[in-house]
A protein has these predicted regions:
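Vicinal oxygen chelate
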Residues: 1, 3-12, 33, 43-46, 53, 65-91, 115, ...
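Long, hydrophobic N-terminal alpha-helical segment
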Residues: 1-38
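Short secondary-structure boundary micro-motifs
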Residues: 17, 27-30, 62-63, 81, ...
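Short, charged helix-to-loop "capping" segments that act as catalytic/coupling loops
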Residues: 24-28, 48, 108
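Short, well-structured hydrophobic secondary-structure segments
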Residues: 38-41, 51
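Short, conserved turn/kink motifs that form compact alpha/beta structural patches or helix kinks used as
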Residues: 57-61
Length: 138
């Protein structure tokens, strides 16, 4: 498994994108995707030779994430790309991580499977099995 991206929850994607561009030199690499399953709007940012950043903005129906961003938002999860989600999910579960979301199509990843786990210290982990991102701009 390798790190694919780190995710931050923001109150407003437009403002979040502008901040990451101004402060760290990141550029938006995907259009904004509305993820109906997770009730968020999503975009990815990149910078040469650096980790990809995913920004999420909650939709009105995502009360828990709305509460989080209303308190300032911030780090949400780290995502690992793996070859076999089912196998790695089982391995990580055997190591004590709690499965939050079983593998399901991820709208931000052109419907390739994603899964979520919870590790110690409140660390949310996403697993994906693709390099694809929906809505690529370049």
């Amino acid at each position: 498994m390798i790190i694919d991206h780190i995710c931050f929850a923001v109150r407003n994607l437009t403002e979040g994108i502008a901040w990451w561009e101004r402060v760290f030199g990141y550029k938006q690499m995907t259009s904004v995707i509305e993820n109906s399953r997770q009730k968020v709007k999503v975009t990815f940012l990149n910078k040469e030779d650096s980790v990809t950043v995913k920004l999420i903005e909650p939709l009105e129906s995502n009360q828990s994430l709305l509460n989080f961003v209303n308190k300032g938002g911030g780090f949400h999860h780290i995502c690992f790309k793996c070859d076999n989600i089912e196998k790695d999910l089982k391995t990580l579960s055997m190591k004590g991580l709690l499965t939050l979301v079983q593998p399901q199509p991820g709208e931000a990843f052109n419907n390739h499977n994603i899964a979520f786990l919870l590790a110690k210290y409140g660390l949310n982990i996403e697993l994906i099995d693709t390099d694809e991102k929906a809505g690529m701009l370049f």
